[in-house]
Curated annotation (Swiss-Prot):
Job description of the protein: Catalyzes the attachment of proline to tRNA(Pro) in a two-step reaction: proline is first activated by ATP to form Pro-AMP and then transferred to the acceptor end of tRNA(Pro).
Pfam families, per database record: HGTP_anticodon, ProRS-C_1, tRNA-synt_2b
Subunit structure: Homodimer.
EC class of the enzyme, as a word: ligase
Lineage, highest ranks first: Bacteria, Pseudomonadati, Bacteroidota, Flavobacteriia, Flavobacteriales
GO MF assignments: ATP binding; proline-tRNA ligase activity
Protein's UniProt name: Proline--tRNA ligase
Length: 492
């Protein structure tokens, strides 16, 4: 129950871990670093998937599916990409097991079943996809290709946390091929904007759009655009990335096309993705010491109706009203559950739905039947009011928008209050220690300074904001000339 959660102010990390498990979102599995996403958690992910999938298709993208395994020679074809992911790769070396002759009932890897070439379990799919695109692209008429894949990937993480960092996770990865550099850059920007729109309109999570520094870019990319969000503990979270790959992968896999003019050129590429890490972002942006707080646009259950009764006769009367409400709410697009399960008492249900972040709860008892009212409770504000039965549906419709907007405004206010401009390294360290959040500071543009600041403070450059204040200044660490401010933060 919510009351058993560790308070955020006492131990934010412990609060998060407890909430994920107690709200029935996910749990650890028998495989170290891998999670089980439980039905309620998966229902939220499905809502995310559905909205993103719609947005992708509305911008001309199609879904496809590519193999989980990547032959090692393909994986290493694009050198920077291979080097960047090498230490995180799981590798298949054999293709069967056999009975262990020394241990009856046990199995062993068959030493005679060694693969001729090792297979990398995909940490990302550029290699297998670009090897495929080579067969799909001959002419400018075959372009652009705009494909998305919903899949699982494996990156062998040692220190894992549910949703935020797991060895296996679910994600979508888009891979596009274009005839021109400008078209590929437009695609990179478009997808980053789509991620920002999704984060703000559906997750009610304000984000900063920007580009990564060279050392923070995706391995093999010429540019990485990103959206960065701020969690309630003052740490940043990278919520989505979109990469301009130039012609690197086309050159690595020799993907060329015949131009309109009759020449032969390498195609231009992008890739972009978000993952179940968004679940962690959603949880940490809005939730409180009582449990999960979900924006209505992503809540699997937007309204729950709980009957309060002492007899079967009362339950029958309440059920009649509740079932009418269910029909009326569903007719206007509201997701609603009537919880008439008699295995648990109303008090337990109230606490459970509060813990699981259901935006609105309706309680109907015998007195409500007499008065023609229902009790309506908001999860975000924990306030209650009585509403006339005839006005409930319109009230709920209005509240869906009001709650969504209110959660965004609250998160945006917190974010804005935690963007601090500093001009000295002493102030930088002080703000980082005492306040956290984003620190807007001048940087001299060198990876050496970037790394030194990271070593000294554990803060990284989250992004160079697209809307940053241009203007010369002095680097916060070295005093060398700076072209403009960037955003630093400690991050997940």
């Amino acid at each position: 129950m919510g009351k058993n959660l560790t308070k955020r102010s006492e131990d934010y990390s412990k609060w998060y871990n407890e909430l994920v498990v107690k709200a029935d979102l996910a749990e650890n599995s028998a495989v170290r670093g891998c999670m089980v996403i439980k039905p309620y958690g998966y229902a939220i992910w499905e809502k995310m998937q559905a909205e993103l999938d719609r947005m992708f298709k509305e911008t001309g993208h199609q879904n496809a599916y590519f193999p989980l395994f990547v032959p090692k020679h393909l994986f290493e074809a694009e050198e920077k990409n291979a080097e960047g992911f090498a230490k995180e790769c799981a590798v298949v070396t054999h293709y069967r097991l056999k009975n262990d002759p020394d241990k009856p009932g046990k199995l062993m890897v068959d030493p005679d079943a060694k693969l001729e070439e090792e297979l990398v379990v995909r940490p990302t799919s550029e290699a297998i996809i670009w090897n495929t695109y080579k067969n799909w692209i001959q002419s400018y008429r075959d372009l652009p290709i705009k494909v998305n894949q919903w899949a699982n990937v494996v990156r062998w993480e040692m220190r894992t946390r549910l949703f935020l960092r797991t060895a296996e996770f679910l994600w979508q990865e888009g891979h596009t091929a274009h005839a021109t550099k400008d078209e590929a850059l437009e695609e990179t920007e478009l997808m980053n904007n789509i991620y920002a729109e999704f984060a703000e309109n559906f997750m009610a999570m304000p984000v900063v759009k920007g580009s990564k520094t060279e050392s923070e870019r995706f391995a093999g990319a010429l540019e990485t655009y990103c959206i960065e969000a701020l969690m309630q503990d003052g740490k940043a979270l990278q919520a989505g990335t979109s990469h301009f790959l130039g012609q690197n992968f086309a050159e690595a896999f020799d993907v060329k096309f015949a131009t309109k003019e009759g020449g032969l050129e390498h195609v231009w590429a992008t890739s972009w993705g978000v993952s179940t890490r968004l679940m962690g972002a959603l949880i940490m942006t809005h939730s409180d010491d009582n449990g999960l707080v979900l924006p209505p646009n992503l809540a699997p259950i937007q309204v729950v109706i709980v009957p309060i009764y002492r007899s079967e006769e009362q339950l029958d009367q309440i059920s009649e009203v509740a079932n009418e409400l269910v029909k009326e709410l569903r007719a206007v697009g509201v997701s609603v559950k009537f919880d008439n399960n008699d295995n648990q008492k109303p008090g337990w249900k109230f606490a459970q739905y509060e813990l699981q972040g259901v935006p609105l709860r309706l309680a109907i008892g015998p007195k409500d039947l007499e008065k023609g009212t229902v009790e309506l409770a908001r999860r975000d504000t924990l306030t209650k009011e009585f509403v006339n039965r005839s006005e409930v549906v319109e009230k709920i419709k209005a509240l869906m928008t009001e709650i969504q907007d209110s959660l965004f405004d609250k998160a945006k206010q917190y974010r804005n209050e935690h963007i601090t401009e500093v001009d000295s390294f002493d102030d930088f360290k002080k703000v980082l220690k005492e306040k956290g959040g984003f620190i807007s500071a001048h940087w001299d543009g060198t990876p050496e300074t970037e790394n030194k600041i990271k070593d000294l403070t554990k803060a990284t450059i989250r992004c160079v904001p697209f809307d940053r204040k241009e203007g010369a200044g002095e680097c916060v660490l070295t005093g060398n000339p700076s072209e403009g401010r960037v955003l630093f933060a400690k991050a997940y």
